[in-house]
């Protein structure tokens, strides 16, 4: 099966070669359709840069990056980028810009709002909503586009516990709507990683230091023996 993403010794370097910053270094990995992958690591480890590279928002400066362009992608950020439009308008506009007729775009947007439980807020200015509601609008906007690949950069990090549970439940539903749906997300929440991921990639200083099935990543003895840096990270985050 053709990989969704295939990286070979990929690097991302900002600034001059001699004095810049290497955000990613020599990253090699393959993502298959239907995988649910968590990216973990400390702040500045390269998680966000890797997600942006996968989505095409960052360019690799070394190595090779191959994307399956036949699969539609959607990406959600920690803070949703919503326009000064109604909730419905924020969703419908994206569809219209991709060629849908305005009436069809509005109908698809309304269906997406049903899925995230925001039909009663359809005409509200999206920027007046709470953080959790805004993230649900962003999810609805992605849902309406019917992507086969969903990339998430700390999607619940800035939310209160109740909103966090709601958004995580929607992400879980989104990720399991078909066997071919691919999910790649960055998170500091190890409980969330256990609930959503089937595979975990640990990054440190722009390098992949561990790439394991989720059950092996949380196996203390295995991680401690073979991936001591990842073990220390898990131990610290769980403290």
Question: Predicted regions span which residues?
Answer:
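The feature captures the beta-strand-to-loop junction immediately N-terminal to the Walker
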Residues: 40-42
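Helix-to-loop junction immediately C-terminal to a conserved catalytic motif
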Residues: 55
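Conserved ABC ATPase "signature" region
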Residues: 103-121
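Conserved ABC ATPase signature
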Residues: 125-129, 133
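Catalytic Walker B motif of ABC-type/P-loop ATPase nucleotide-binding domains
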Residues: 150-153
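H-loop/switch region of ABC-family ATPase nucleotide-binding domains
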Residues: 187-188
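Conserved beta-strand-loop-alpha-helix hinge in the C-terminal portion
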Residues: 207-231
């Amino acid at each position: 099966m053709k990989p969704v993403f295939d990286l070979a010794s990929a690097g991302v370097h900002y600034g001059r070669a001699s004095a810049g910053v290497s955000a990613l270094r020599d990253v090699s990995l393959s993502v298959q359709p239907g995988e649910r992958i968590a990216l973990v690591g400390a702040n500045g480890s390269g998680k966000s840069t890797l997600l942006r590279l996968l989505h095409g928002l960052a360019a690799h400066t070394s190595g090779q990056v191959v994307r399956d362009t036949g699969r539609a992608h959607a990406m959600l950020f920690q803070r949703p980028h919503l326009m000064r439009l109604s909730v419905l308008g924020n969703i419908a506009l994206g569809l219209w810009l991709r060629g849908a007729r305005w009436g069809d775009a509005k109908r698809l947007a309304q269906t997406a709002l049903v899925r995230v439980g925001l039909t009663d807020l359809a005409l509200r200015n999206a920027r007046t909503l709470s953080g959790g509601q805004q993230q649900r609008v962003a999810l609805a906007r992605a849902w309406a586009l019917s992507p086969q690949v969903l990339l998430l950069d700390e999607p619940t990090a800035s939310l209160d516990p109740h909103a966090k549970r709601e958004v995580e439940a929607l992400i879980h539903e989104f990720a399991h709507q078909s066997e071919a749906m691919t999910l790649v997300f960055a998170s500091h929440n190890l409980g969330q990683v256990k609930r959503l991921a089937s595979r975990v990639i640990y990054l440190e200083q722009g390098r992949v230091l561990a790439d394991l099935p989720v059950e092996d990543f949380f196996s203390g003895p295995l991680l401690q023996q073979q991936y001591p840096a990842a073990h220390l990270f898990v131990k610290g985050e769980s403290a």
